[in-house]
């Protein structure tokens, strides 16, 4: 009935009237899709019945028009159902399998594809059985009113420093972003060793001729004990056939959990204290053991450990003792640590990041760029307002490349100042800042083999040098200070950054630089 409040649709009186309606981008009249649209005409059904010449759209009361929204489909959410073939296989699974056969270094994007590839299926089974042996969880019926997270498989091809394949790694990762603070986790901070500590210890090792070994702990986070109750669904592809409805109550940490790094560090620190080690007050990831007959240091960066010992026998005994508690793998002499290549020479150790530099250049699309001999030009005056703003996608890429350059400064003090300059514009990068990054990358291309040379020395003297300009920043007139700290002839720490406050004189800026160098 025209005047019925239950009417839910309106039909135009004629094609002409239909074509006169404004059409929304989704192909529907905008007056029907936009809730804020108003309908002209009388609000009384009696009035509308007395106007036979008016169109049905005008005659319908405003309350009868129901806004129509686009349906929330799977394609709009980026969810696509795999196309099944007549033989029962799935198109994208077959494509992944063909890619894995053609390229052994390819990484599958789903656990369904990995299960069809022999070496990845073996890696998944090894990870799953390691979790069972470690008693990571216990299958329990789902308790009421608990937060149950899920998990996913992550695949990674581990490579040597020369690019050759070391092993295929499958890792079960919990979706920790579904955890709730105060319910599933509390504190999350976990320390890692500082680069300055690494360089200082390497300088001591070279000078004293001590043993230098590298250890790796397999399934690192699985050794940490959880203090909170965390529940997780059974791993995809490895559900218990007898108890498919049960869930996992985690008793030990798992990769992806918010508190996993902290739980692992607490477990490792407890084990090292049992062996007589104490953490350093300057760096809590440095553990020391000093006895009359032996001196040992352990540098811990999550699961990567550097073992320094004055006695080879004591180092072997410690590795065996730690192997009783953790799955410790002795990698032998230090050669590759956290993306840093360590080369032993008669004149000491050489630290380089050639492999990482090439990966960074490839990520930036500048692997075949024209090299340059300096990271910055003395005539370049970079400011925060010159140039056009980058698009959101380019700004994200800018921040990613800057972060990669920051990590490259671990062994490259020559680019420290230039990288600090481009770091000052992460909030709103412009095309002039991007040009500065490209020049730094061109310099990296020219100096791929540059690094640090740590020489043996009998000196135990710490020397520090500092310098500062005055009001050098054109944006806020703050000064830039820098320092370099040497242990004997070896450079172990440096910095070049803008000072936190404005200096009223060059003397004040210099004093601030000295304070930063000695802090």
Functional labels for PLM-detected ranges:
Residues 172, 185-189, 193, 198, ...:
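Divalent metal-binding acidic/histidine catalytic loops
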Residues 1-270, 274-281, 286, 387:
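Chromodomain-type histone methyl-lysine reader module
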Residues 76, 165-166, 184-185, 225-227, ...:
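Short coil/turn segments at secondary-structure boundaries
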Residues 233, 308-331:
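Active-site-proximal acidic secondary-structure segment that organizes catalysis
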Residues 139-144, 214, 278-280, 298-299, ...:
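Short beta-strand
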Residues 267, 271-275, 321, 325, ...:
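Generic non-transmembrane alpha-helical segments
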Residues 216-219, 249-257, 279-309, 322, ...:
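Catalytic palm active-site di-aspartate
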């Amino acid at each position: 009935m025209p005047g019925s409040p239950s009417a839910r649709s309106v039909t135009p009186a004629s094609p002409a009237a239909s074509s006169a309606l404004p059409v929304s981008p989704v192909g529907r009249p905008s007056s029907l899709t936009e809730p804020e649209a108003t309908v002209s005409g009388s609000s009384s059904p009696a009035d509308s019945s007395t106007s036979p010449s008016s169109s049905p759209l005008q005659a319908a009361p405003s309350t009868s028009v129901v806004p129509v929204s686009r349906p929330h489909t799977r394609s709009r959410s980026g969810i696509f159902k795999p196309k099944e073939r007549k033989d029962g296989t799935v198109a994208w699974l077959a494509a992944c399998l063909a890619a894995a056969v053609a390229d052994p270094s390819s990484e599958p994007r789903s656990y369904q594809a990995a299960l069809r590839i022999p070496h990845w299926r073996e890696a998944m089974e090894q990870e799953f059985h390691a979790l069972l042996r470690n008693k990571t969880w216990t299958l329990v019926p789902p308790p009421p009113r608990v937060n149950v997270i899920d998990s996913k498989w992550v695949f990674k091809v581990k490579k040597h420093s020369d690019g050759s394949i070391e092993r295929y790694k499958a890792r079960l990762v919990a979706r920790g972003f579904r955890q709730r603070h105060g319910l599933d986790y509390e504190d999350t901070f976990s320390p890692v060793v500082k680069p300055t500590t690494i360089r200082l210890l390497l300088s001591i090792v070279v000078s004293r001729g001590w043993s230098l070994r590298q250890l790796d702990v397999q399934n690192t986070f699985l050794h940490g004990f959880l203090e909170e109750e965390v529940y997780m669904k059974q791993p995809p592809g490895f559900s218990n056939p007898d108890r498919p409805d049960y869930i996992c109550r985690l008793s030990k940490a798992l990769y992806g959990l918010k508190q996993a790094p902290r739980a692992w560090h607490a477990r490792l620190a407890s084990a090292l204290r049992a062996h007589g080690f104490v953490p350093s007050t300057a760096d809590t990831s440095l553990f020391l053991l000093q006895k009359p007959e032996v001196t040992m240091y352990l540098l811990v960066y999550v699961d990567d450990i550097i073992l320094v010992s004055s006695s080879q026998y004591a180092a072997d005994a410690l590795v065996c003792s730690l192997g009783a508690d953790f799955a410790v793998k002795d990698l032998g002499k230090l050669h590759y640590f956290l993306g840093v290549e360590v080369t032993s020479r008669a004149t000491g150790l050489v630290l380089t990041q050639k492999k990482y530099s090439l990966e960074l250049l490839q990520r930036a699309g500048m692997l075949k760029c024209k090299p340059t001999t300096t990271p910055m030009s003395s005539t370049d005056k970079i400011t925060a307002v010159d140039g056009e703003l980058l698009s959101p996608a380019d700004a994200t890429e800018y921040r990613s490349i800057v972060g990669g350059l920051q990590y490259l400064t671990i062994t490259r003090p020559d680019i420290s100042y230039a990288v600090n300059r481009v770091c000052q514009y992460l909030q709103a990068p412009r095309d002039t800042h991007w040009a500065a990054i490209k020049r730094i990358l061109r310099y990296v291309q020219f100096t791929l083999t540059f690094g640090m040379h740590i020489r043996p020395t009998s000196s135990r003297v710490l020397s520090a040098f500092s310098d500062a300009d005055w009001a050098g920043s054109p944006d806020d007139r703050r000064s830039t200070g820098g320092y370099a700290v040497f242990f004997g002839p070896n450079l172990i720490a440096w910095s070049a950054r803008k000072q936190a406050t404005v200096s009223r004189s060059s003397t004040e800026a210099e004093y601030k630089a000295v304070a930063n160098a000695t802090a």
